[in-house]
Every structure is written in structure tokens, then in C-alpha cells.
Amino acid sequence: MALQGNVAILTRLQDTASAVQQFKQTNPQVADVTVLAVAEDSDVTQTVTSSSASAKENAFDGIVSFSEQTEELGIELGAVLPLLKTGGVLQLHVANVKEEKKNAILMALMIGGLVDTSDKQESSPFYPEFSDAVSFTSKKQSFESAAIPLAVKSTTTQPIKKWTVLADDFGDDQDDDIIDEDTLLDDTDEVLQAAKADCGDAVGGKKRACKNCTCGLKDENDKPVMSEKDLNSLVSGCGNCFKGDAFRCGSCPFLGKPAFKPGMEKVLLNLDSSDDI
């Protein structure tokens, strides 16, 4: 990459006439040279920001600069690069470059947006104080940007579907779909009675439930048959029969009967009770 066109040079050199002449001879494609003198008590950043050149963004095709403290290189590049045109060339001179220092410089140039960096050991008439100087030559990357088309949200709304009810929907023919609850089966239905009649075989004139009885005949046959006298003569084995169903066992003959006093032969209902029901 060769310097060409309008080039700015930052240097601490006071008398730059001979240096500029030598620079043009070395770089014949350079048409014009602008020298930005850096004072002894100043630095590159202060010189660029305080000079009239700072108002001329993208003014130069090339910039020649130097760095005395690579720790401040990022700040210096932030001040210098706005003056460089897109695709322009930056030539940076640094003295006493070691391997670790070189890597830091290359990283700073890359972060600054410079590409195609090359380095070589080279002295410059603008920096006679630099011993073993290395020049880093880079190109300012051109970042092209384009507008991203935005998808415009459609303002057209779809019509909301509505249910429509016609008068014919309430005709007499719809009554056929309504279930009559009186036709539903219950435990006393004749169908259930017929199922009991078909269950098992009659033995000695008494129906005996089949092995897998589901009609309730088995439970009915297994229920103990006791007379009222037998019920009154029963003695509680658990002692809780008189307390009510909540305390009675599953086979208690008093299930379903109200609570009574211990020792009572019969269970009487007090119909004259004034308690609220």
C-alpha cells in the first residue's frame, strides 16, 4: 500500500522542509503534504483535536503519525482516524518494538477498524529521535451499510366469524334429540329384575347366584335374615351398636337404625322432639 493524494504528517520536528522534500521523493504519488506539528508539551491527540484539521473529517488520503506510548494508541487512533478517508492509508511509526509490544499494536489497529496491516523496520526523516523504528501500514476499512426493509404490518383486519341462528333451528324436529330422563334405567328397573331372574340356577326352589354375579343377587342371598325378636336379643360384641352408624361395624344388624340407649330392647323414634331438623 503506497501513500498517495493529500497526506497529513504528525511530527515533533521543527524544520520540516527538507523532510517533506525527501518524503515526496520517496512517495511520488503524494500530491500535497499537510504538516501537523506536535509541541514538546503536547501529544498526538491534543494536536489533532486543537488544530483546524480536526474539523475536516475524511480530508486526507493518507496520514503519517507516530506513537510514543502504545498504551495510549487506542485514544490516538480515535482522534486521527476520523481525518482519514475510507480506503485511505495510515502509516504509524513506533520505536523499540518488541514482540509483545508488536502484538498489542496490531490488536489496537484491528480494533480501530484498520485492515491489511503490514510492518517493516524503517526509519523516517520526520522521526530522527526514533531508534530501531518500525512502521505499521494499514488501510481504513470501508464499512458499507444499507437500509434494512422493514415489514409493514398489514392494517387489513379479517372479518370476525359470527354464529348465525335461523328460526328453522328451533323446529319441532329438534325435540327428538332431547333425552327423556324418565326413560333412564335405575336400580328398580324391570331390566335389572330380569337380570336377577336369569342369574344362576334354582336349587331346592331358591335361586342361587352365579359365580361372577353382578346383578346383586349374591349380596341379597348373603344378607342374614333375622326376626325382630332375634334383633332385640342380640348383644353387641363391640359395644358401639347403640351409638349410631358412625360407630357400628360393617356387619352390624343395627345398620340404618337410629342410636338408642344401652340395654334398650327396641329402638324407638322420638317424634315429639322439639329439636330443629
UniProtKB/Swiss-Prot annotation:
GO terms for biological process: iron-sulfur cluster assembly. Residues 199-215 are annotated as: Fe-S binding site A. Pfam families: CIAPIN1 (PF05093). It is found in: Cytoplasm; Mitochondrion intermembrane space. [4Fe-4S] cluster binds at residues 238, 241, 249, 252. GO terms for molecular function: 2 iron, 2 sulfur cluster binding; 4 iron, 4 sulfur cluster binding; electron transfer activity; metal ion binding. A motif (Cx2C motif 1) lies at residues 238-241. [2Fe-2S] cluster binds at residues 199, 210, 213, 215. It comes from the Eukaryota. Residues 238-252 are annotated as: Fe-S binding site B. Residues 1-134 are annotated as: N-terminal SAM-like domain. Residues 135-191 are annotated as: Linker. Keywords: 2Fe-2S, 4Fe-4S, Cytoplasm, Iron, Iron-sulfur, Metal-binding, Mitochondrion. A motif (Cx2C motif 2) lies at residues 249-252. One of its GO terms (cellular component) is mitochondrial intermembrane space. Its cofactor is [2Fe-2S] cluster; [4Fe-4S] cluster. Monomer. Component of the cytosolic iron-sulfur (Fe-S) protein assembly (CIA) machinery. Required for the maturation of extramitochondrial Fe-S proteins. Part of an electron transfer chain functioning in an early step of cytosolic Fe-S biogenesis, facilitating the de novo assembly of a [4Fe-4S] cluster on the cytosolic Fe-S scaffold complex. Electrons are transferred from NADPH via a FAD- and FMN-containing diflavin oxidoreductase. The C-terminal domain binds 2 Fe-S clusters but is otherwise mostly in an intrinsically disordered conformation. Belongs to the anamorsin family. This is Anamorsin homolog. It comes from Phytophthora infestans (strain T30-4) (Potato late blight agent).
